[in-house]
A protein has these predicted regions:
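Short hydrophobic targeting helices and cationic amphipathic motifs
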Residues: 16-19, 27
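A short, acidic, amphipathic alpha-helical segment used as a generic capping/interface helix at domain edges
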Residues: 280-296
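Short, positively charged and aromatic/hydrophobic N-terminal segments
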Residues: 24-32
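Alpha/beta catalytic cores of group-transfer enzymes, especially the acyltransferase/condensing modules
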Residues: 43-45, 72, 131-279
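Non-catalytic positions within long, well-ordered alpha-helices that form the structural scaffold/packing
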Residues: 110, 211, 292-293
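FabD-like malonyl-/acyl-CoA
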Residues: 35-171, 217, 221, 298-324
Length: 324
């Protein structure tokens, strides 16, 4: 018969410490980690009056808006605060305006402590500033150059985009491949929602075939060109030089990029991915899936609108969503 006896009093502390370590090691795989991911919107979320309340109520925001007027060479604040929808739709205004609104919100928010970040298309530049990779001035300068380069590319190659609702990604890809014209997937927004990009004739043909294949909607978009497609090659070449000569810093947290839905701590890789973004699809579905797999429990949209929150709920239904 074996009788267990407690250790002598002098050894009780070491015994309990040892027992505690064993229990901790046993429970370690089940430790709950609650990580926050901040996500930044792209073009299309602009609205008249955006940022005006921030300008009037916060000195940090006011200083950043005034600095933006200097960097851009025109008073973007006048268009953002009082411009009409047509003025806001101008590419030279839209992209800097959304970037400004997003980055300034992140700057003035006391709760902004991201564990990881990502941005949809244009929003990737906001994410790079928020993670310390780019300075505010350099980020804004690149966004301005991106907007102008894309506008020129649209003038060279008249083109458009369309939203396809209700078909799986593989079916959309197959239809795009079957068309003897430039038509490619541009935004993998969420399951059952994919935006295609290409020539006007190619998009018209694609919309007809998508509808015949069972798409609930095949909706041409009111945009100036085929973003995230080979037709943006002139803009990619133009922006490449600007990105390569801009100083990039090591990110303070993981930045998930559009072209591969992954993050990198290597500056050269971040630059290469950012250059490729203009002619490559935005892999948003995979980005959110990867962020969730790697610990993100709450996705916080930082910028105008709530479009990204809706996409997250469709991609990762168990995740929490919020906005600032």
């Amino acid at each position: 018969m074996h009788v267990w006896c407690p250790p002598a009093k002098s050894g009780i502390d070491s015994f309990l410490n040892s027992l505690g370590r064993k229990i901790s090691l046993f429970l370690m795989p089940y430790k709950i980690i609650f990580m926050k991911a901040y996500i930044f919107p792209g073009q299309g979320s602009q609205f008249s009056g955006m940022g005006k309340d921030l300008f009037e109520s916060n000195s940090i925001a006011k200083n950043l808006f005034e600095k933006a007027n200097e960097v851009l060479g025109f008073k973007i604040t006048e268009v953002m605060f009082a411009g009409n929808d047509e003025e806001l739709k101008q590419t030279r205004v839209t992209q800097p305006a959304i970037f400004l609104h997003s980055v300034i919100l992140a700057n003035i928010s006391e709760s902004f402590k991201p564990d990881m970040v990502a941005g949809h298309s244009l929003g990737e530049f906001s994410a790079l500033v928020a993670s310390g990779v780019l300075s505010f001035e350099d980020g804004l300068s690149l966004v301005r150059k991106r907007a102008m380069a894309m506008q020129r590319a649209c003038e060279i190659n008249p083109s458009t985009m369309a939203a396809i609702i209700g078909l799986d990604d593989k079916k959309v890809e197959d239809i795009c491949d079957s068309i003897n014209d430039i038509v490619v997937p541009a935004n993998y927004n969420c399951p059952g929602q994919l935006v295609i990009s290409g020539s006007k004739s190619g998009i018209d043909r694609a919309c007809k075939l998508m509808t015949e294949a069972g798409a609930r909607r095949a909706l041409p978009l009111n945009v100036g060109g085929a973003f995230h497609s080979p037709l943006m090659e002139p803009a990619r070449v133009e922006l490449e030089a600007a990105i390569l000569e801009t100083n990039f810093n090591k990110p303070s947290c993981p930045v998930y990029q559009n072209v591969n839905a992954k993050h990198s701590m290597k500056i050269d890789e971040i630059k290469i991915n950012l250059i490729a973004q203009l002619t490559s699809p935005v892999r948003w579905t995979q980005t959110i899936q990867n962020m969730a797999k790697e610990g993100a429990k709450e996705f916080i949209e930082c910028g105008p609108g709530k479009v990204l929150q809706g996409l997250v709920r469709k991609i990762s239904p168990d995740s929490l969503t919020a906005s600032i």
